[in-house]
Design a protein with these regions (language model features):
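Short intracellular "coupling" helices and adjacent cytoplasmic loop segments at the cytosolic face
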Residues: 2-10, 110, 118-142, 146-148, ...
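Juxtamembrane loop-to-helix connectors within ABC transporter transmembrane domains
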Residues: 17-18, 26, 105, 125-170, ...
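An intracellular "coupling" helix at the cytosolic face of ABC transporter transmembrane type-1 domains
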Residues: 28, 129-130, 148-155, 159, ...
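Transmembrane helices of ABC transporter permease
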Residues: 28, 32-45, 157-211, 282-295, ...
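Transmembrane helix-loop-helix hairpins at lipid-water interfaces of multipass membrane proteins
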Residues: 33-97, 178-182, 293-297
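Hydrophobic alpha-helical transmembrane bundles that constitute the permease/transmembrane domains
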Residues: 41-49, 91-99, 151-154, 158-170, ...
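Helix-loop-helix
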Residues: 64, 175-189, 259-333, 337-338
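ABC-type nucleotide-binding domain
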Residues: 355-603
């Protein structure tokens, strides 16, 4: 089992570029976004106007109280009551607009998450196999779960707070200037200090937010890998090793998350301290102005409240900066995934071949291929396969057997040479049309959560129940299926662990039989089953392969002695080819392989 935990190298992040790309993405939701912004501004406007209206009530109360003490008048409670009722209406409208804005932004953020998940899921189907072979499953899943969730949550909160904070700052500034420009100047002295502190913290914390998102994908990959292979871990007593690997990755996640959250957490205490200094200065100067009759008591009360309201959006902007960093880190990982190079799904229209012409004739002509430019796996592979032939590809591990199948199905394209089907290069077929011509039974069986009937029908979705049952009978699977609880309607769990490995193999063969493809590929199809089950499988496969071109890849040479053609591969080249009897008679590399497995039979 490979040791998990190796982190892929992250290229430099583009914070501004990611935000611009995200803004362009939000363009399709402009109506909801603009409406939410309008309601956010309206809600903020009524909140801003509140202290100024309340100032009139405060002034009327103070003036009336002084007049009452002097015996020259009384408190006008009717006037004050009307002001308070008007103020209550303003705050109710503000709350209603805030509720509508929140409802719109929640819907918008969820739509964005929905669309990103859909795009990622569609993208997965268009990515080349090489992408997944270089990454862990958990890392890919992290894009569609953690990154998209982080993006949606940050988007929902950051846009609203950003608009509200900016609107509040502008509105409060206007109201403060209308009360006292001198006191406003004193209050504004805290702004450059606050802004400088925010920029410093953002600069130092951004790299840790990026690292946090990256290592989170690695941790997910480890958890997924260990969970899927927990039987192997326990069998080899590797719990301690796995735990150490996980702890190493978890320590990195803890370190990056702690630093990012600690630095971002410094913003609020610092901002509160700076804001309180400004608040004290304004209170002292305002008291002096009020004592000298420059401004009214109500205006002092309103101004002090505005100062508090002015520092609050600055603090909110510091929180928004944290959310924007987290959102940008997640969004860039999503955009990186969506911008990955895709397979060419469509062939050149000028040369496009009709998949109906595929009848099983396959020609490999001087094929050369390497997974990387500096390491060639297939050097010079040539072979002619006639329709209906059973072709066995044998050789030691690393000889290139499975690679040839990947090239045949265009999971990869050859570096040089060609592979043709009935004279047409495989690159002249649309990928989906080409792959519909192949049926595969892999060594690693894949069954999804669902009924046995649904799993077999996956080979041909429009198949009737009778056709599914017929395919199961042909694969010698009908008997054991009927003995299971529920029969064909039995529900397989997530990893199909409620059936045996041999039964899984029979179900995948039944699925391939149902697909009824012209070319069949068997990759170690019977290597994980007992002898009796293997005999049943072999009987079913012999019936299936009649009239179809079949490629059989196996180390167990007993399964391919009746092959029409055996290709013996070694170090990426065909070193021998012929029937079983011919190759045994030659006494070459194939004979050595065979004798090493069946020495008692040869003797």
């Amino acid at each position: 089992m490979p040791r998990p935990g190796r982190m892929t190298t992250e290229r430099a992040k583009d914070f501004k570029g990611t935000l611009l790309q995200l803004v362009r993405t939000l363009g399709r939701y402009r109506l909801s976004l603009v409406t939410a912004i309008v309601f956010a501004i309206l809600s903020t406007f009524f909140n801003i106007a509140g202290p100024k209206v309340l100032a009139k009530a405060t002034t009327a109360l103070a003036t009336g109280w002084i007049a009452k003490l002097r015996g020259t008048g009384s408190i006008d409670f009717v006037y004050i009551g009307r002001i308070l009722l008007f103020l209550l209406g303003m705050y109710l409208l503000s709350s209603a607009f805030s509720f509508i804005q929140g409802w719109l932004m929640t819907g918008l953020s969820q739509k964005v998450c929905y669309d990103f998940r859909r795009q990622i899921n569609e993208k997965i189907n268009r990515l080349p196999l090489a992408y997944f072979e270089k990454r862990t499953v958990g890392e890919v899943l992290s894009r569609i779960t953690n990154d998209v969730d982080t993006l949606g949550q940050s988007l929902n909160q950051s846009i609203t707070q950003l608009i509200t904070s900016v609107t509040t700052m502008i509105g409060v500034l206007v109201m403060m200037l209308s009360i006292s420009p001198k006191m406003t100047l004193i209050a504004l002295l805290i702004l450059p200090v606050s802004l400088a502190l925010v920029l410093i913290v953002v600069r130092f914390s951004q790299k840790y937010f990026k690292a946090q998102q990256a290592i989170l994908g690695v941790v997910n990959g480890q958890v997924e890998e260990v969970y899927s292979g927990h039987n192997v871990v326990k069998a080899f007593n590797r719990e301690a090793v796995v735990l150490n690997d996980f702890n190493a990755a978890n320590d990195k996640l803890y370190e990056s998350a702690w630093k990012s959250q600690f630095l971002s957490g410094l913003m609020m205490p610092i901002m509160n301290f700076v804001g309180n200094l400004g608040y004290v200065a304004v209170a002292i100067v305002g008291s002096i102005f009020a004592a000298n009759g420059i401004i009214t008591i109500g205006d002092i009360q309103a101004f002090i409240q505005y100062v508090k309201n002015f520092t609050q959006p600055i603090q909110q902007l510091s929180q928004v900066s944290n959310m924007l960093q987290s959102m940008a880190a997640a969004a860039e990982r999503v955009f990186e995934f969506l911008n990955e190079p895709e397979e060419d799904q469509q062939a050149d229209p000028a040369r496009r071949a009709d998949p109906a012409c595929i009848d099983g004739q396959v020609t490999f002509s001087h094929v050369r291929f390497g997974y990387t430019p500096d390491k060639t796996v297939i050097h010079d592979f040539s072979c002619e396969v006639k329709p209906g032939q059973k072709v066995a590809i044998v050789g030691p591990t690393g000889a290139g057997k499975t690679t040839m199948v990947k090239l045949l199905m265009r999971f990869y394209d050859v570096d040089s040479g060609s592979i043709t089907l009935n004279g047409h290069d495989v690159r002249d077929f649309d990928r989906s049309a080409l792959r519909e011509g192949f049926g595969m039974v892999l060594q690693d069986t894949w069954l999804f959560k669902g009924t046995i009937m649904e799993n077999i029908r996956y080979g041909r979705l429009d198949a009737t129940d009778e056709e599914v049952i017929a395919a199961a009978k042909a694969a010698n699977a009908d008997h054991f299926i009927r003995t299971l609880p529920g029969g064909y309607q039995m529900e397989l769990n997530e990893d199909a662990s409620n059936v045996s490995q041999g039964q899984k193999q029979l179900l995948t063969i039944a699925r391939t039989i149902l697909a009824d493809n012209r070319i069949l590929i068997l990759d170690e199809a019977t290597s994980s089953v007992d002898t009796r089950t293997e005999q049943r499988i072999q009987t079913a496969m012999d019936r299936l392969m009649e009239g179809r071109t079949s490629f059989v890849i196996a180390h167990r040479l007993s399964t391919i002695r009746d092959a029409d053609l055996i290709l013996v591969m070694r170090d990426g080249d065909i070193v021998e080819q012929g029937t079983h009897d011919q190759l045994i008679e030659v006494g070459g590399f194939y004979a050595d392989l065979y004798n090493s497995q069946f020495e008692d039979v040869v003797e």
